[in-house]
Swiss-Prot record:
Reaction catalyzed: N-terminal N-formyl-L-methionyl-[peptide] + H2O = N-terminal L-methionyl-[peptide] + formate
Name under which the protein is recorded: Peptide deformylase
Organism whose genome encodes this protein: Thermosynechococcus vestitus (strain NIES-2133 / IAM M-273 / BP-1)
Cofactor binding mode and count: Binds 1 Fe(2+) ion.
PANTHER family according to UniProt: PEPTIDE DEFORMYLASE
Length: 188
């Protein structure tokens, strides 16, 4: 179900929240479940959307802005004023396809680095929306990839942990001022 938080899709000179980058410990801590969806949670989601749009992103998880809560926002059509963003609270992947796709990913917490990652092509996710209502979504394509990427953030996993080409990963990280020591490879 679409979000109904009133947020203008534009860049702000001073986004409301500060992004955290690869190497920051906050990105590696598992986020805590949200016990009650209220105005304070909706305010966090609104600020996350404003920060995401300001950074030209299509997804953002609360840990990326230093908030240790299971909240994520996604908008795979940020240039379409009619497309509503998705707010997911306490999301859980319930099922996923056996079919895998390899696509390039990037991350607001690792600017400039874009590398191929293998993920399930389809996912079924249960979550609460910004009003606390239980929802289930079946997603494919870019939306499925964005959801999986952001849910990873909620568990302290970053997309670079899933990159199979370690030599290219080290090169790209170094090229953009990051160190490979901040990566925690996940066995394929």
């Amino acid at each position: 179900m679409a979000a109904s938080l009133a947020v203008e899709k534009k860049k702000l000179k001073n986004p409301p929240l500060q992004l955290h980058y690869l190497g920051d410990r906050v990105l590696r801590q598992p986020a805590k479940r949200v016990s009650k969806v209220d105005d304070s949670i909706r305010d966090i989601a609104r600020k996350m959307l404003q920060t995401m749009y300001s950074a030209d992103g299509i997804g953002l998880a609360a840990p990326q802005v230093g908030i240790n809560k299971q909240i994520l926002v996604i908008d795979i059509h940020p240039d379409d004023p009619e497309a509503e963003p998705l707010v997911m609270i306490n999301p859980v992947i319930k099922d996923f396809s056996e079919e895998l796709e390899v696509c390039q990913e990037g991350c607001l917490s690792i600017p400039g680095v874009y590398l191929e990652v293998r993920r399930p092509a389809m996912v079924e996710v249960s979550y609460k929306d910004e009003w606390g209502r239980p929802q289930v979504i079946m997603a494919g394509g870019l939306l499925a990839r964005a959801i999986q990427h952001e849910i990873d953030h909620l568990t302290g996993v970053m997309f670079v942990d899933r990159v199979e080409n370690q030599a290219l990963l080290r090169h790209e990280l170094k090229e953009h001022g990051f160190t490979a020591s901040a990566v925690r490879p996940i066995a394929a």
